[in-house]
């Protein structure tokens, strides 16, 4: 294409094709969705003058292909080997670890300073944890779909990745969620650890790429913020409702929705330890960092945050920011003399991987079980039943957090009264 070679402007190269050329169904939709029969395959081979041997590639073709690959890439390979030879021992070791996919990730000490007022948003904690990981783990690279200031998914003190600076840790993907997910899969195939980020309501734009992440078992970290109806006046377009249920249904994919700073740290520890496809779902509102939440228990999927003081009468399961609301409900019910247990379930898929003994210990059968989550009820029927879920099965509303919560009945007073009524039935 001499014209393309002589121009630095965008070029469209159009190549005319005929679907199913040489087949009896040439030029029709039949050849698109149906396999060719043996007779058709035979006559195609006769037309092309090729041997009638199944799956045969001649040595001549193989040799030509190998020569072509070497002609195109030989210089690049030689240049790469020369650059590797010039590396110091530390860099050579890191390169070997990258190629062998054996670089250890140490998250014993997270560089997170707990705020004086004891409150922080999980998206803010996530940003600090990502940067803490980046200090000790050179293979972390990622970015967002033009919303890093909102999702906090950005590595500080490093340049943006570009042609001129390929060592940059941040990638400016632009508002291109689908491409972002696909690029992350490619990066993961090189044994780097990519993270990508956008608002949770926009996760549907990259669902195809994310599904392939799970199919290929790639350790891509999906970071989604603005996780519920409490994100403000942007309204239903920015308020995810059905997304959590959909994510929890994806095979070979772990979805984490941490309640506070402790669980956010625990989510990242689990993600990096397991090296599996995963998403972390984050809130934008500051929430209390609970004394009894445990980062070490997140990998189990669910654990007891508050145990019943007297005989167990009811269990409340919750996730994300709703733990703060649930704790208020718990306090009131305990004061009234009810035996209530609070279970935080940051990851449903991780909980389902635990032993039957552990699951029975956390959620014993025969106990009235309630759910509090600002999301669809669809993923919760395994643990409870209709009428015991404080969830949302409609689109959200535009308004501030308190007004929207009130409109959907998400206040401690409303929920506490309904749970008390159910306990007495």
Predicted region positions:
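Residues at structural and domain junctions
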Residues: 27-30, 62, 66, 112, ...
């Amino acid at each position: 294409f001499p014209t393309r070679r002589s121009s630095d402007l965008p070029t469209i190269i159009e190549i005319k094709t005929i679907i199913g050329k040489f087949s009896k169904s040439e030029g029709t939709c039949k050849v698109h969705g149906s396999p060719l029969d043996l007779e058709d395959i035979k006559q195609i081979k006769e037309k092309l003058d090729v041997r009638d041997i199944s799956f045969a590639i001649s040595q001549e073709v193989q040799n030509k292909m190998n020569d072509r690959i070497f002609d195109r890439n030989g210089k690049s390979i030689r240049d790469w080997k020369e650059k590797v030879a010039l590396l110091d021992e530390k860099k050579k070791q890191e390169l070997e670890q990258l190629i062998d996919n054996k670089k250890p990730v140490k998250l014993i000490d997270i560089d997170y300073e707990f705020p004086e007022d004891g409150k922080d948003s999980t998206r803010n904690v996530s940003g600090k944890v990502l940067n803490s990981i980046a200090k000790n783990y050179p293979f972390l690279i990622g970015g967002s779909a033009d919303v890093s200031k909102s999702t906090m998914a950005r590595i500080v003190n490093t340049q943006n990745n570009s042609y001129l600076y390929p060592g940059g840790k941040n990638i400016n993907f632009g508002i291109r969620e689908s491409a972002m997910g696909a690029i992350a899969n490619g990066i993961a195939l090189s044994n780097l650890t990519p993270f990508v980020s956008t608002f949770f309501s926009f996760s549907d734009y990259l669902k195809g790429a994310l599904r392939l992440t799970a199919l290929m078992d790639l350790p891509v970290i999906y970071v989604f913020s603005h996780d519920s109806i409490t994100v403000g006046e942007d309204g239903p377009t920015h308020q995810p409702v059905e997304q959590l249920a959909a994510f929890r249904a994806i095979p070979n994919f772990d979805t984490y929705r941490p309640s506070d700073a402790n669980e956010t740290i625990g989510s990242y520890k689990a993600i990096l330890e397991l090296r599996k496809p995963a998403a972390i779902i984050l809130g934008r509102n500051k929430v209390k960092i609970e004394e009894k939440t445990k980062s070490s228990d997140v990998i189990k999927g669910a654990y007891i945050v508050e145990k019943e003081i007297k005989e167990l009468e009811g269990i409340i399961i919750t996730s994300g920011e709703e733990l703060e609301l649930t704790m208020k409900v718990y306090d009131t019910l305990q004061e009234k003399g009810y035996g209530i247990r609070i279970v935080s379930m940051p990851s449903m898929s991780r909980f389902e991987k635990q032993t039957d003994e552990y699951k029975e210990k956390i959620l014993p059968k025969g106990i009235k079980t309630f759910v509090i989550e600002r999301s669809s009820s669809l993923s919760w029927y395994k643990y409870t039943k209709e009428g015991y879920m404080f969830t949302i099965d409609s689109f959200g509303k535009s308004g501030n957090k308190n007004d929207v919560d009130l409109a959907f009945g998400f206040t401690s007073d409303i929920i506490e009264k309904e749970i008390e009524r159910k306990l007495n039935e």
